[in-house]
Curated annotation (Swiss-Prot):
GO molecular function, one term: RNA binding
Key words, A-Z: Isomerase, tRNA processing
Taxonomic path: Bacteria, Pseudomonadati, Pseudomonadota, Alphaproteobacteria, Hyphomicrobiales
Catalytic reaction(s) noted: uridine(38/39/40) in tRNA = pseudouridine(38/39/40) in tRNA
Family statement drawn from the similarity comment of this UniProt entry: Belongs to the tRNA pseudouridine synthase TruA family.
Active-site positions on this chain: 52
PANTHER family: PSEUDOURIDYLATE SYNTHASE, TRNA PSEUDOURIDINE SYNTHASE-LIKE 1
Entry protein name: tRNA pseudouridine synthase A
Binding sites annotated in the UniProt record for substrate: 113
Lineage top rank: taxon: Bacteria
Enzyme Commission designation: 5.4.99.12
S-S pairs: none
Oligomeric form and interacting partners: Homodimer.
Length: 248
């Protein structure tokens, strides 16, 4: 059976996350149902990142095995047609046959996330659901400097969910940048893999530095505590986007 790679974007606002949920809509389910309507096959997708409820993606990657070597453009267009008909806020950007040993999750060598903070007195209107609105002025420069403390290989127990199923809390954070453009603050994070809720936990703690609630030393102490209770506020899912996945 030929294996297809799917490049996907979606608005996570209306979904309970990527992964199948018993009684709530998921991105995975929406795409699998669209594929079944296209080719009559009940399939199971595997994705590079199992995003949480409310988290968006502009560059999610998944793979699926189909019975026929359909042209990639046909798969893309047909699945999109069924997604549109279902009213799902999901789009297949590209579909292509890949080697049988390609695995969207385990073949990935890097994942890239963007977190957007709307930092102004007025709430979000056009971007509601796509940003974290923080009305108090944040010092993005202080956030960026503090972020450097989290770079490299660390035990990120403080910054992972208590429900995280990863065998080890140790991860190597390759990038964590904070920048401001007008009222928008962007936090960009890159690593081979992330722990559950790690990016949102780091952003929430950096926000505490930005509003003067924490010093750099207090952020460092939180990291070194290796204690979930030491984490700052967990940023809401609205502002988080999976924006890239690397493969060899």
């Amino acid at each position: 059976m030929p294996r297809f790679r799917l490049d996907i974007e979606y608005d996570g606002s209306l979904f309970a996350g990527w992964q199948h949920q018993a009684d709530q809509p998921s991105v995975q389910q929406a795409i699998e149902q669209a594929i079944e309507k296209f080719c009559g096959e009940a399939v199971r997708l595997r994705a590079a990142g199992r995003t949480d409820a409310g988290v968006h993606a502009s560059a999610q990657v998944a793979h699926v095995d189909l019975a026929k070597p359909w042209p990639g453009d046909k798969v893309r267009d047909a699945v999109n047609a069924h997604l549109q008909a279902a009213g799902a806020h999901v789009a297949i950007l590209k579909a292509a046959i890949v080697p049988d040993d390609f695995d969207a999750r385990f073949s990935a060598t890097g994942r890239h996330y963007l977190y957007r903070i709307l930092n102004r007195r007025a709430p979000a209107a056009l971007e509601k659901g796509k940003v974290w609105w923080v009305p108090k002025r944040l010092d993005a420069g202080a956030m960026h400097e503090a972020a450097k403390l989290l770079l490299g290989r660390h035990d990120f127990t403080t910054f992972r969910s208590t429900q995280c199923q990863a065998n080890s809390p140790v991860r190597t954070l390759e990038r964590l940048d904070v920048s401001r453009a007008g009222d928008m603050i962007e936090v960009r994070a890159s690593a081979r893999s992330f722990l559950h809720n790690q990016v949102r936990s780091m952003v929430g703690s950096l926000k505490r530095v930005g509003d003067g609630g924490w010093t750099e030393a207090e952020l460092k102490a939180a990291l070194e505590a290796r204690d979930r209770a030491a984490c700052g506020q967990v940023a809401p899912p609205d502002g988080l986007f999976l924006i890239g996945v690397d493969y060899p």
